[in-house]
A protein has these predicted regions:
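The feature captures the beta-strand-to-loop junction immediately N-terminal to the Walker
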Residues: 32-34
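Helix-to-loop junction immediately C-terminal to a conserved catalytic motif
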Residues: 47
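Conserved ABC transporter NBD signature motif
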Residues: 55-69
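Q-loop/switch helix immediately C-terminal to the Walker
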Residues: 79, 86-100
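Conserved ABC ATPase "signature" region
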Residues: 93, 106-124
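ABC transporter nucleotide-binding domain
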Residues: 171-249
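Short, charged/small-residue-rich alpha-helical element at the C-terminal edge
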Residues: 223-286
């Protein structure tokens, strides 16, 4: 029997479901979809903050509302608001005393020190929250979610709105947590943000998972782009018109065969290239087809 870190079974509620999913220890799964798809609500159900109308959430086999299970979950909300007058260290101390099971071996100061290292905030420990930039606020969200050695992290838009360097840094920190067995479910309205992080992707639309699978499989489709000297009167079968010319999924045929089809239609081919379909394209296609 597989020991899942997190399971949601037949979850339904207001503008949500039915949804079922399971997350393995050390797995990073990305939840993507347009605004209003239900990503945040599903994460809040998984965290035990919102009760579903039907279905069940379990954390390491325990019901999510079991106090022991709650100690295993860390949640970082989108646009999380922190008390701005506190220092980073004092804020995390407050959360440690409020939410973490402490003991002689797990003193609040030790938990805070560990969370600061995890999030890369040790140098900012004595800074006031209202002096932090966007990237450090996102790191602070990760620190409070991971505080206390949580084994399941639910991260809502933690990578959104960051420059490439800050995003890469946070992705590396999340990946290191996963390498230690922490299960991560992370949402993003920007699918490209998850392409370097998530091993599995779930596409949400109108509160339902409409497509799911390993990222490598979803991104495995090759697309032929053809640049033309003049726009076509009509594209060949299987091609669609783009700003530069045409494109089509190769879907088992060779590049040579696809280009031969273009030439058979007397199209003025200037150049061509093969690219891999992006996660953003997959999300848009899924949205348009449902």
């Amino acid at each position: 029997m597989t020991d899942y870190a997190l399971t949601l079974t037949d979850i339904s509620g207001r503008r949500l479901g039915p949804v079922s999913l399971a997350l393995l220890p050390g797995e990073i799964a990305g939840l993507v979809g347009p605004a209003g798809a239900g990503k945040t609500r599903l994460l809040r159900v998984a965290a035990g903050a919102v009760r579903p109308m039907t279905g069940e959430v379990r954390v390491w086999g325990m019901r999510v509302r079991d106090p022991t299970a709650r100690q295993l979950i860390g949640y970082a909300g989108d646009s999380q608001i922190f008390p701005r007058a506190l220092t980073v260290h004092d804020l995390l101390m407050y959360y440690a005393r409020l939410h973490c099971a402490v003991s002689r071996e797990r003193a609040p100061r030790g938990l805070v020190r560990e969370a600061l290292e995890i999030a890369g905030l040790a140098a900012a420990a004595d800074l006031r929250v209202d002096s932090l930039g966007r990237a450090d606020l996102h790191r602070l969200s990760l620190a409070q979610a991971a505080l206390g050695g949580r084994r399941v992290l639910l991260l809502d838009e933690t990578l959104s709105g960051l420059d490439a360097f800050a995003r890469r840094d946070l992705c590396g920190r999340i990946a290191r947590l996963a390498a230690e067995g922490v299960a991560v479910l992370i949402t993003s309205r920007d699918p490209a943000a998850l392409e370097r992080l998530a091993a599995r992707v779930l596409v949400l639309r109108d509160g339902r998972i409409v497509r799911a699978g390993p990222l490598a499989t979803l991104l495995g489709e090759r697309i032929l782009e053809v640049i033309l000297d003049a726009p076509p009167a009509e594209p060949p079968p299987g091609f669609r018109v783009t700003a530069a010319g045409l494109e089509a999924p190769l879907a088992g045929r060779t590049v040579e065969a696809a280009l031969a089809l273009c030439r058979a239609h007397r199209l003025p081919v200037r150049a061509s290239r093969v690219r891999v379909k992006s996660l953003e394209e997959i999300v848009l296609e899924t949205h348009d087809s449902h």
